[in-house]
């Protein structure tokens, strides 16, 4: 909990003003679609901050649950509100990140959605050995064909747990370049090396 609180306040310092900007289109889009917006203040505020972080990382407001890929068409579908949201709301009652839900959802419903989301992103054990995190081999989201949790989420969690330096193994060049970009945004040094069957990124 302490680490989560520290991360929240760090993100608020970086993106608090941007989060207020996102409030406008989120509410407008929900009204237009007949959806509700997550009524739980902490997760809702975090989601706005994470969207702002995604925008700073990638130049677009991609869904905060997923790292964009090297597939441009898929990436367009990931721009929040993503093109998968309606299908998920029709099926489970809320979109994957829990930002939007059916119009009749209660705070208790959103709490259940949040618990499921946190189980995916914080309940999955990190493959971390001797300061090296292997991000490969995660569950693949059926609709998007993307790993959950992705490399960026795993790395942020690992840094919170063990700090720097951190070695990271990723499957693709795109993931490696994203980590290099994260390093630049967070005042870290990132070194990328291509291996035979994976990419290695050293963060310090």
Model-derived regions: residue spans:
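Residues in the short beta-alpha loop(s) of Rossmann-like NAD(P)-binding domains
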Residues: 103, 172-173
């Amino acid at each position: 909990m302490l680490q989560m609180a520290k991360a929240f306040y760090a993100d608020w310092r970086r993106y608090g003003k941007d989060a207020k900007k996102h409030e406008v289109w989120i509410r407008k889009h929900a009204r237009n679609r007949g959806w509700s917006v997550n009524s739980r203040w902490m997760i809702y505020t975090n989601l706005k901050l994470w969207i702002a972080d995604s925008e700073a990382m990638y130049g677009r407001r991609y869904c905060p649950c997923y790292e964009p890929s090297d597939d441009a068409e898929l990436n367009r579908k990931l721009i929040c509100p993503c093109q998968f949201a309606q299908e998920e709301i029709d099926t489970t009652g809320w979109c994957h990140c829990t930002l939007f839900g059916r119009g009749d959802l209660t705070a208790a419903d959103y709490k259940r959605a949040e618990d499921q989301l946190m189980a995916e992103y914080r309940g999955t054990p990190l493959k971390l050995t001797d300061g090296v995190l292997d991000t490969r081999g995660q569950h693949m989201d059926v609709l998007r064909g993307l790993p959950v949790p992705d490399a960026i989420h795993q790395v942020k969690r690992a840094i919170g747990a063990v700090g720097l330096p951190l070695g990271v193994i990723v499957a693709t060049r795109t993931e490696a370049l994203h980590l290099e970009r994260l390093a630049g945004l967070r005042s870290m040094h990132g070194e990328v090396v291509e291996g035979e069957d994976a990419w290695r990124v050293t963060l310090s």
